[in-house]
Amino acid sequence: DPTVLFLGSYGYQPNVVAAEYLVEKIWPIVMDNMPKARLIIAGKEPQNLRCYSDQVPGVEFPGFIDDLDELYSRTRIVCTPIFSGGGTRIKIIEAAAYAKPILTTSIGAEGIPMQHGQELMIHDNQRNFADACLALLKDFSLCQQLGNRARKFVIEYYDRKKNVELIKGLFRAGMGVPL
């Protein structure tokens, strides 16, 4: 099934805004073109979402999910339309680790040196975001290419051993002592 995932904690306002944007602005366009598509809005506190009690066609609110492997296995793409907030974009790094294609916004991609069209897709305009979502849902090959490149990037860029050595090097340079 063509399934889109947004995963977050809905006690955090930027995730509330993102989920409501997907359900209210993007999903009607997707459903007009792909009536069998599904959107999973997963995560803690979904009752904080304005659209939670609505019966939106093709949208599921399963709440907190213990088994992320199973959730990602039935997901074709991950959409993270983040418009505010800071911090590390763990949801993007996690989706990339699962080799899932990622559709996000410029703010959603902040701090992650992935490139639009290479490891993920970035669109800030509502129509372009919806069109990119549809393109990904319809093109399994493109999904595989983006997902595989994203996974390769995350493995290389966020490698624990490599980052520990980098941090040690920074300490050595700053303190002038061997570690």
Q: Which role fits each region the language model picked out?
A:
Residues D1-R74:
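Conserved catalytic-core segment of nucleotide-activated headgroup transferases in glycan assembly
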Residues G11-P14, G87, M121, I155:
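Glycosyltransferase donor-binding loop in the core domain
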Residues G63-F64, T80-G86, I107-G108:
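Short Ser/Thr-rich beta->loop micro-motif in glycosyltransferases that lines
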Residues S73-G87, Y98-P101:
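Acidic donor-binding loop of glycosyltransferase active sites
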Residues K91-A95, P101-T105:
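Short hydrophobic beta-strand element within catalytic cores of glycosyltransferases
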Residues S106-G117, M121-I122:
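Short acidic/histidine- and often glycine-rich active-site loop of Leloir-type glycosyltransferases
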Residues L120-R127, A135-F140:
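Conserved acidic donor-binding segment of nucleotide-sugar-dependent glycosyltransferases
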Residues L142-E156, N163-G169:
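A short, well-ordered alpha-helix in the C-terminal region of glycosyltransferases
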